[in-house]
């Protein structure tokens, strides 16, 4: 196998990527123990994520879908860090380091992952700031910065802040009686520099402001305070603009967003007697696992950055300073906030096979003949209907299914949880 590199064929890109593997002649024996015959699993996944990011530059996709590809890259990288990177760090933490099939030790892999990930994430923000946002501006979709707010827009933002944000935000001053709070995995937070004394007479030079996940990260400005177009404001901009209202009587010297990614990998023993209980415990603890990555606004002062790194037990290798929002995944909301069907793919309505369009029992339909559903061309709802009926059917003893990456409002989970028969196993 060669170790040469080939140039990526994407127009305008001179990045080097691994060359295609040389296939040995037929009959030639392959040494399966040779490290050079294997790619590193984590670096290979990073390259896949990069291919997703490059879709954001593909002008054959509608503009909003290109932004979504940029967001999907962020979502993929989140999972990569909280599972893959976390797993390598766990090996080092507990002295269980093993050499991968590619010959890399965990520390070597982490160093190379950091180098490549920093490069990819820099390119992601470059694409966002210098390609996607300017193209959206041309399409009259504006991300309105604080310095660009008109007096009418600034007044609307103030009202929105006081009515929607202020009641649900809980600032946490840092002092000897108030240690650094436990922050939820991947939550948006702000570190605030302060001067003066708070309402209780305490000198608090620093505070943390967690932003509840219930708050939208993007808000659409109403048309009556804009001069046409689709105008969006970042939640971070609104909090920055009115941080002083969170700390009455104190001077806000700086406000900077940051986000911590934690270890979210599940560790279960092989000889578990109660899988469900073990999973419940692991799912609760994964919200507060060890830190694996710190994302910080690139204008955050160095002393605050170092303070955060020390607090989370991280190093410069784990630090990602970004020019823009620290969580681009939430920009997927743009598609639902703007009325521009010309800038996105049209919706697709999957069909339902004629045999199961009626309201009869899914079990009765299956008894007549096998039913094959081809997703996404055919609707998934018959599967959910089957699970709902099975959960209530007294003749069903157990429902066992593997679910991958379920959403917060999964219909399948709802169907399985809706059974009134506690004796039925749902695994």
Name each region found by the language model.
Residues 2-427:
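N-terminal localization/anchoring segments of enzymes in phospholipid and broader phosphate metabolism
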């Amino acid at each position: 196998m060669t170790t040469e590199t080939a140039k990526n064929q994407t127009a305008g890109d001179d990045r080097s990527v691994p060359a295609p593997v040389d296939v040995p002649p037929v009959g030639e024996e392959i040494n399966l123990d040779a490290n050079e015959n294997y790619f590193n699993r984590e670096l290979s996944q990073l390259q896949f994520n990069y291919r997703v990011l490059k879709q954001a530059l593909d002008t054959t996709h509608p503009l909003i879908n290109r932004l979504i590809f940029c967001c999907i890259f962020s979502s993929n990288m989140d999972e990569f860090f909280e599972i893959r990177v976390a797993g390598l760090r766990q090996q080092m933490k507990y002295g269980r380091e093993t050499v991968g099939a590619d010959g890399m030790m965990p520390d070597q892999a982490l160093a190379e992952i950091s180098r490549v990930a920093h490069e990819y994430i820099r390119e992601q923000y470059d694409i966002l700031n210098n390609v996607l946002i300017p193209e959206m501006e041309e399409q009259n979709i504006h991300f309105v910065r604080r310095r660009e707010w008109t007096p009418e827009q600034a007044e609307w933002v103030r009202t929105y802040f006081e009515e929607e944000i202020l009641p649900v935000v809980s600032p946490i001053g840092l002092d000897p009686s108030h240690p650094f709070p436990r922050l939820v995995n991947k939550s948006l937070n702000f570190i605030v520099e302060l001067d003066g004394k708070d309402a209780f007479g305490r000198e608090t030079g620093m505070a943390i402001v967690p932003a509840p996940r219930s708050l939208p990260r993007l808000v659409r400005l109403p048309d009556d305070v804009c001069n046409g177009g689709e105008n969006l404001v970042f939640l971070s901009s609104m909090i920055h603009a009115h941080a002083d209202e969170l700390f009455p009587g104190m001077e806000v010297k700086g406000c900077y967003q940051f986000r911590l990614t934690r270890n979210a990998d599940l560790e279960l023993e092989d000889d578990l007697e109660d899988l469900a209980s073990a999973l419940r415990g692991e799912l609760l603890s994964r919200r507060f696992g060890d830190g694996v990555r710190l994302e910080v606004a690139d204008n955050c002062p160095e002393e605050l950055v170092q303070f955060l790194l020390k607090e989370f037990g991280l190093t410069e290798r784990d630090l990602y300073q970004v020019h823009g929002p620290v969580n681009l995944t939430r920009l997927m909301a743009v598609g639902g906030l703007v009325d521009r069907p010309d800038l996105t793919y049209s919706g697709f309505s999957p069909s339902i096979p004629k045999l199961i369009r009626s309201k009869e029992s899914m079990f009765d339909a299956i008894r007549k003949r096998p039913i094959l559903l081809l997703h996404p061309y055919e609707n998934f709802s018959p599967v959910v209907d089957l699970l709902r009926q099975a959960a209530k059917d007294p003749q069903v003893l157990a429902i066992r299914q593997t679910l991958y990456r379920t959403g917060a409002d999964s219909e399948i989970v709802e169907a399985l949880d809706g059974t009134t028969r506690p004796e039925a196993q749902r695994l």
